[in-house]
């Protein structure tokens, strides 16, 4: 019989936070994870429960309505004290200093073979309906459609001036294998798409779900462009934050890299000139910025617009029998607040 893990035996996580599954095992051993087998609906209930427990420890839902092959995680970054423990930071000041040091000393990511990559245990090329492999959510009854808002884009190599970029883009797959891809003006992705709009070329990317926590943290580093300009190595900084290089793998169907330890990956390309409405309601009215949609991080900014489109060429995933984990990341919570401010705080420092 294995000796039970006691809190007094535990040390700040290092290797344990290099992928999401081992992170959750470590959090559970620490007593910092809520786990439930009760059914939860991605429509309103996931985010409703997260908001009710805002600022508490992470929550894993093992029984998701309509999604028998997925689990859903929220609140991973909801408690700043849990974040500090995950990465071995002694306090808030230590966190800020060490992330600032990671800016100066990125660890170059390592590439592994496709046969080794957990995120490519199963491969589905040319999927008819991407939503089958996702867990779209809805926050409020004002939103007419569910959204995929927690995927982390991965742009590397020549498409990011030789560096690497991580970030969020909300998506709505209204056309099976094609979804809208909202981009914040001024962001790294906006800079990339602006360049390729002029050249009328698609941008190959991957959207990764259930990634190493350090990558989630760096995805919230938007608009720190004095410290993290185009061409920087955000994946390298994430490696420095977790204390070991991030593992990458070549995508199966496009010229892009994926986070090898992700749970699910969408491969494809962004078409800068193929712009479509995010919701059927806004399309029918042919009006941008009037009708409600995903509330966005501030809780009140969500309106439907025309956006570039993401054309999915393949979905790769960990074995679906193991129920890959989607980090749903409800907005206007301490979860996304901590993600969006922690790295920026270090950039200011």
Walk through the language-model features, giving the residues of each:
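Extended, highly charged
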Residues: 2-309, 313-349
């Amino acid at each position: 019989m294995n000796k039970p893990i006691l809190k007094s035996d535990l040390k700040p996580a290092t290797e344990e936070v290099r992928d999401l599954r081992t992170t959750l095992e470590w959090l559970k051993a620490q007593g910092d994870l809520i786990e439930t087998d009760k059914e939860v609906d991605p429509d309103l209930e996931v985010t409703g429960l997260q908001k009710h427990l805002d600022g508490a420890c992470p929550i894993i839902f093992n029984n998701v309505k309509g999604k028998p092959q997925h689990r859903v995680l929220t609140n991973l970054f909801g408690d700043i004290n849990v974040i500090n423990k995950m990465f071995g930071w002694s306090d808030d000041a230590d966190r800020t200093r060490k992330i600032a040091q990671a800016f100066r000393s990125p660890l170059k990511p390592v590439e592994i073979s496709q046969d080794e990559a957990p995120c490519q245990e199963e491969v589905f090329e040319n999927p008819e309906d991407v939503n089958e492999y996702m867990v779209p959510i809805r926050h409020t009854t004002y939103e007419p459609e569910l959204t995929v808002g927690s995927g982390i884009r991965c742009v590397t190599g020549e498409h990011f001036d030789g560096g690497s970029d991580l970030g969020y883009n909300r998506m709505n797959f209204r056309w099976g294998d094609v979804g809208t891809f909202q981009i914040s003006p001024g962001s790294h992705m906006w800079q990339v798409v602006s360049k390729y709009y002029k050249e009328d070329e698609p941008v190959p990317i991957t959207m990764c779900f259930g990634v190493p926590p350090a990558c989630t943290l760096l995805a919230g580093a938007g608009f720190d462009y004095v410290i993290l300009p185009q061409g920087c190595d955000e994946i390298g900084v994430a490696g420095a934050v977790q204390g070991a290089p991030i593992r990458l793998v070549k995508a199966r169907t496009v010229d892009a890299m994926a986070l090898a330890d992700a749970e699910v990956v969408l491969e494809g390309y962004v078409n800068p000139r193929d712009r479509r409405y995010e919701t059927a309601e806004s399309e029918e009215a042919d009006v941008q910025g009037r009708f409600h949609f995903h509330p966005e991080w501030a809780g009140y900014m969500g309106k439907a617009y025309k956006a570039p489109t993401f054309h999915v060429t393949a979905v790769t995933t960990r074995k679906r029998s193991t129920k890959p984990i989607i980090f749903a990341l409800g907005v206007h919570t301490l979860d996304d607040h901590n993600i969006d401010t922690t790295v920026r705080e270090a950039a200011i420092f």
